[in-house]
């Protein structure tokens, strides 16, 4: 193992032990830093050190992510992927500087490409109801149908990340209070309300599981173990196939739908930020949006001059 690989391993250990990063986050960092390390070795040889990485090498790395200097090479990564990979490299060298193993972060001045501001897809209310009620409209009864309904209800009711949902234990759900305790990113705990429809679905699902220990997983996979992210994604995609004008829908779609419907219902951004577990309000601002028609409706109802103009027009007609 060369010095670069050794330091990458130490950085990943730091993320796990000191920052309480999730396994998913650590895996993403590992993948991005291993890709960077492979590029460095291809340019500087198999035995490389963090001290051999300079601004020029990082510029070459950025060019490779964009598809290479040769225009005949493959198409590059999306801007969002390039930004994530550069952020991983910048964080890695920043850690080396903070731990006094390097004097300067060579990635600090590498500009991150601006991401396209695409609005995430969300469901309207009718589509949401169609999705959530789909398992109950099959005309069949299977144990997984009650589980799937409970999962769909909870994702939409509380805006959970899929990793938060799969990590839930029975004791995390307070059915009497209508609350659920969630372990979010970085091990941060928050308490989130659970709506009555979701509670009812959870009651029906748990009633079929008998006596449960507090530390038992709240949701099980088909083999009786804790449900995983992939299974949740598959069941969401399966039941979403019945939605008119179907498109790719993931568990995260329900999280965004939750935030959008909360905002449209009058919730303020700070409250939505707390419910989603965002550390920064700017993340919530990017995450939520209101359609133009909804904005115009709110404006017409709320702005004094808008109402006054309508009244004047009505009187003159």
UniProtKB/Swiss-Prot annotation:
Subcellular locations according to the entry: Cytoplasm
Protein name, entry field: Tyrosine recombinase XerC
PANTHER family on file: PHAGE INTEGRASE-RELATED, TYROSINE RECOMBINASE XERC
Keyword Transmembrane helix found: no
Keyword Cytoplasm: yes
HAMAP family membership: Recomb_XerC_XerD (MF_01808)
Pfam families listed in its UniProt record: Phage_int_SAM_1, Phage_integrase
One example GO MF annotation: DNA binding
Function statement: Site-specific tyrosine recombinase, which acts by catalyzing the cutting and rejoining of the recombining DNA molecules. The XerC-XerD complex is essential to convert dimers of the bacterial chromosome into monomers to permit their segregation at cell division. It also contributes to the segregational stability of plasmids.
InterPro entries recorded: CB, DNA_brk_join_enz, Integrase-like_cat_sf, Integrase_catalytic, Integrase_recombinase_N, Integrase_SAM-like_N, Tyrosine_recombinase_XerC/XerD, Tyrosine_recombinase_XerCD
Protein family: Belongs to the 'phage' integrase family. XerC subfamily.
CDD domains tied to this protein: INT_XerDC_C (cd00798)
UniProt domain Tyr recombinase: residue ranges: 118-300
GO annotation, biological process: cell division; chromosome segregation; DNA transposition
Keywords from the named record: Cell cycle, Cell division, Chromosome partition, Cytoplasm, DNA integration, DNA recombination, DNA-binding
Quaternary structure note: Forms a cyclic heterotetrameric complex composed of two molecules of XerC and two molecules of XerD.
Active site: 161, 185, 252, 255, 278, 287
GO cellular component: cytoplasm
Residue stretches making up the Core-binding (CB) domain: 2-97
């Amino acid at each position: 193992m060369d010095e670069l690989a050794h330091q990458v391993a130490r950085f990943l250990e730091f993320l796990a032990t000191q920052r309480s990063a999730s396994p998913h986050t650590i895996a993403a960092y590992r993948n991005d830093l291993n890709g960077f390390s492979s590029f460095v070795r291809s340019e500087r040889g198999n035995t490389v050190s963090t001290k051999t990485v300079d601004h020029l090498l990082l510029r070459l790395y950025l060019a490779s992510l964009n598809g290479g200097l040769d225009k005949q090479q493959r198409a590059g990564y999306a801007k969002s992927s390039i930004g994530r990979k550069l952020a991983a490299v910048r964080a890695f060298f920043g850690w080396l500087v903070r731990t006094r193993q390097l004097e300067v972060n060579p990635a600090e001045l590498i500009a991150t490409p601006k991401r396209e501001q695409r609005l995430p897809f969300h469901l309207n209310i009718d589509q949401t109801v169609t999705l959530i009620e789909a398992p109950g409209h099959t005309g069949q009864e299977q144990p997984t149908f009650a589980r799937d309904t409970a999962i769909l209800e909870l994702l939409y009711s509380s805006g959970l990340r899929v990793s938060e949902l799969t990590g839930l234990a029975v004791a995390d759900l307070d059915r009497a209070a209508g609350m659920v305790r969630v372990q979010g990113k970085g091990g941060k705990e928050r308490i989130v309300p659970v709506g009555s429809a979701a509670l009812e679905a959870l009651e029906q699902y748990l009633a079929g599981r008998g006596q449960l220990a507090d530390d038992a997983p709240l949701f099980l996979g088909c083999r009786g173990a804790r449900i995983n992210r992939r299974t949740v994604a598959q069941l969401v995609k399966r039941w979403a196939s019945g939605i008119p004008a179907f498109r790719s829908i993931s568990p995260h779609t329900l999280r965004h739908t939750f935030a959008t419907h909360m905002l449209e219902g009058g919730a303020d951004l700070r409250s939505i930020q707390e419910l989603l577990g965002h550390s920064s309000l700017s993340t919530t601002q990017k995450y939520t949006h209101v359609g133009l028609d909804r904005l115009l409706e709110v404006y017409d109802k709320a702005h004094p001059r808008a109402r006054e103009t309508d009244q004047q027009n009505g009187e003159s007609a």
